[in-house]
From Swiss-Prot:
InterPro entries: KaiB-like (IPR039022), KaiB_domain (IPR011649), Thioredoxin-like_sf (IPR036249). Gene3D superfamilies: Glutaredoxin (3.40.30.10). Keywords: Biological rhythms. GO terms for biological process: rhythmic process. Belongs to the KaiB family. The gene is kaiB3. This is Circadian clock protein KaiB3. A paralog of KaiB1, the major clock oscillator protein in this species. KaiB3 and KaiC3 may cross talk with the core oscillator. The monomer reduces the ATPase activity of KaiC3 by 55%, the homotetramer has no effect. A metamorphic protein which may reversibly switch between an inactive tetrameric fold and a rare thioredoxin-like monomeric fold (KaiB(fs)). Pfam families: KaiB (PF07689). SUPFAM superfamilies: Thioredoxin-like.
Length: 102
């Protein structure tokens, strides 16, 4: 696997509106900001409860960035692109990060 590739796991509960919104938001963010450098795995905790238990998922939706390290989690609303990217410690290519001046 490409070392620059971002590996995400999105834990959802069934086919609820909230689950569908989380899926749509994550794919939108990835397509707009990560190009083709991502892989998203969708895990329904109703169908795969053991996976949720292994990752200690208590609330859905939960998004986990598996790779690259460090592992990061976001829980709940994922509609704000900037908050999601910052929460996952991801800086998209071409984004100009301004550091505060002394």
């Amino acid at each position: 696997m490409d070392m620059n590739r971002i590996v995400l796991r999105l834990y959802i509960t069934g086919n609820s509106v909230r689950s569908q919104q989380a899926i749509a938001n994550i794919y939108r963010i990835c397509q707009e900001d990560l190009g083709d450098q991502y892989n998203v795995e969708i895990i329904d905790v109703l169908e795969q409860p053991q996976r949720a238990e292994e990752e200690k998922i208590m609330v859905t939706p939960t998004l986990i960035k598996q790779l690259p390290p460090p592992l990061q989690r976001i829980i709940g609303d994922m509609s704000n692109t900037e908050k999601v990217l910052l929460g996952l410690d991801i800086v998209p290519e071409g984004l100009q990060v301004r550091l505060p001046e002394d």
